[in-house]
Amino acid sequence: MLLLLAEYLQQFYKGFAVFQYLTLRGILGVLTALSLALCLGPWMIRTLQNRQIGQSVRNDGPQSHLSKSGTPTMGGALILSAIGISTLLWADLRNHYVWVVLLVTLAFGAIGWVDDYRKVIEKNSRGLPSRWKYFWQSVFGLGAAIFLYMTAQSPVETTLLIPMLKDVSIPLGIGFVVLTYFVIVGSSNAVNLTDGLDGLAIMPTVMVGGALGIFCYLSGNVKFAEYLLIPYVPGAGELIVFCGALIGAGLGFLWFNTYPAQVFMGDVGALALGAALGTIAVIVRQEIVLFIMGGVFVMETLSVVIQVASFKLTGRRVFRMAPIHHHFELKGWPEPRVIVRFWIITVILVLIGLATLKLR
């Protein structure tokens, strides 16, 4: 929005041309979203407390979690508001990738909001029934996948890139739609499963989002893309503004979500952020790198799959409790130790993901 204004004002003062720089608008996106989250956070927490919108805690979980009962939830609305406002202010709204990522994020956030509303406000422990949750996730995921497939400007935009192998890629054709669907929906649910401890999901999301922002910037620049042997995706660089907003909003939310949390993001935040990461990774053709960098999300998801499959097949549980962060808690790890160690793992995995830019 402000970019369009700056372009108009350039005829009166050439200094406004500085807003053409993606890096500047990315930084402004971070600072704007961070400021919004920090300023609106206390008000939102008070509002949630006054309306008694608090988290319910399972009795069969770690005993240390019982003290969390009643902590305000649905704080993900703060993250989405900060991301949305910052992106609309600083991104080029003529760029269709910006709208795809923003609309997917808000759509999955709406699914999470309905789920949280039914659980917290209507006191329905089931929330939004799983079949309806996955139905709407499928609708929005497939919608985004089909749109990206139909608007692809070159074959490389629908080709699966294999990291570290410069001469190996797989043309997907219509299979691009299937892969994109699974990446978006899978990423959304993986982040949601990870969101079980104070700050556990948001910091890895920020780190992975920041790394994807680097991929967006490089993929959107033809010279960098050619030098690094990554797909050149015209217009993808503009997503650095969204990624910047995600970083700022995430850090602002972490201010209130760090142990002991004053607010939880709820499904409204977790489902939306996961879908955003998946959509961005698809656009810049880095699905496998997302799998690497988001290893914590993958580990959490696999722990649930393994636990359920093992119990159904053998009647035994592999872990003391799933997702796996609860397993470590029940082993005696203090919650902050679990959180920080998962953060450290994410730092390592993100560095490995970034290293694939040169390892070819």
From Swiss-Prot:
One of its GO terms (biological process) is cell division. Its EC number is 2.7.8.13. InterPro entries: Glycosyl_transferase_4 (IPR000715), PNAcMuramoyl-5peptid_Trfase (IPR003524), PNAcMuramoyl-5peptid_Trfase_CS (IPR018480). Keywords: Cell cycle, Cell division, Cell inner membrane, Cell membrane, Cell shape, Cell wall biogenesis/degradation, Magnesium, Membrane, Metal-binding, Peptidoglycan synthesis, Transferase, Transmembrane, Transmembrane helix. Its main location: membrane. The keyword Cell inner membrane applies. CDD domains: GT_MraY. The keyword Transmembrane applies. The chain crosses the membrane at residues 25-45, 73-93, 97-117, 132-152, 168-188, 199-219, 236-256, 263-283, 288-308, 338-358. GO terms for molecular function: metal ion binding; phospho-N-acetylmuramoyl-pentapeptide-transferase activity; UDP-N-acetylmuramoyl-L-alanyl-D-glutamyl-meso-2,6-diaminopimelyl-D-alanyl-D-alanine:undecaprenyl-phosphate transferase activity. Its cofactor is Mg(2+). It catalyses: UDP-N-acetyl-alpha-D-muramoyl-L-alanyl-gamma-D-glutamyl-meso-2,6-diaminopimeloyl-D-alanyl-D-alanine + di-trans,octa-cis-undecaprenyl phosphate = di-trans,octa-cis-undecaprenyl diphospho-N-acetyl-alpha-D-muramoyl-L-alanyl-D-glutamyl-meso-2,6-diaminopimeloyl-D-alanyl-D-alanine + UMP. It is found in: Cell inner membrane. Catalyzes the initial step of the lipid cycle reactions in the biosynthesis of the cell wall peptidoglycan: transfers peptidoglycan precursor phospho-MurNAc-pentapeptide from UDP-MurNAc-pentapeptide onto the lipid carrier undecaprenyl phosphate, yielding undecaprenyl-pyrophosphoryl-MurNAc-pentapeptide, known as lipid I. This is Phospho-N-acetylmuramoyl-pentapeptide-transferase. The lineage of its organism: Bacteria, Pseudomonadati, Pseudomonadota, Gammaproteobacteria, Pseudomonadales. The gene is mraY.
